[in-house]
């Protein structure tokens, strides 16, 4: 009787070992399918949208900061907002966002191309320099000449949104 019980235990042990190996093989198969099927990845990529800034209908290349103000602005503007901006001081364009968003102002000296939040509800784009207390939102990647021709006007129209 002891021999029969011992034989059954050995068979059960081998059966359990076989189950654990097939589990690993299924896991490996899933990993292989993930790497061999780029369709899933590209489908996800195509669903992602890009947050775009346009000045007078010209798309500008901007590098956004990673902060709460930018996150809130992007969430607010994801369906698109249009802001009429007015030149101020001969070095910046200023326009109301239309709502108050989180700010973390600090005394900074801006450079041409800097995009900042002022008073938690206004966006400012610089084509000159200034020192004041702002929350930096980003920087437009253009040279001084390009910024001047785009922004050195009495008014510009700024559009923000996902595309």
Locations of the language-model features?
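Well-ordered alpha/beta subsegment
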Residues: 138-163
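Residue-level recognition of conserved beta-strand edge/terminus positions
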Residues: 119-120, 159
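Positively charged n-region of N-terminal signal peptides that target proteins for export
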Residues: 1-4
């Amino acid at each position: 009787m002891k021999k029969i019980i011992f034989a059954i235990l050995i068979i059960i042990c081998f059966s359990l070992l076989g189950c654990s190996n097939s589990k690993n093989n299924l896991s490996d198969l899933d990993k292989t399918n993930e790497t061999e099927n780029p369709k899933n990845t590209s489908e996800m990529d195509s669903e992602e949208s890009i947050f775009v800034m346009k000045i007078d209908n010209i798309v500008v290349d901007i590098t956004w900061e990673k902060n709460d103000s930018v996150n809130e602005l992007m969430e607010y503007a994801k369906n698109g907002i249009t802001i009429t901006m007015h030149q101020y001081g001969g070095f910046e364009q200023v326009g109301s966002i239309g709502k108050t968003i989180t700010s973390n102002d600090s005394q900074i000296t801006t450079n041409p191309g800097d995009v900042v939040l002022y008073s938690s509800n206004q966006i400012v784009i610089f084509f000159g320099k200034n020192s004041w207390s702002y929350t930096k939102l980003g920087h437009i990647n253009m040279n001084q000449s390009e910024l001047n021709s785009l922004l050195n006007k009495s008014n510009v129209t700024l559009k923000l949104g996902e595309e």
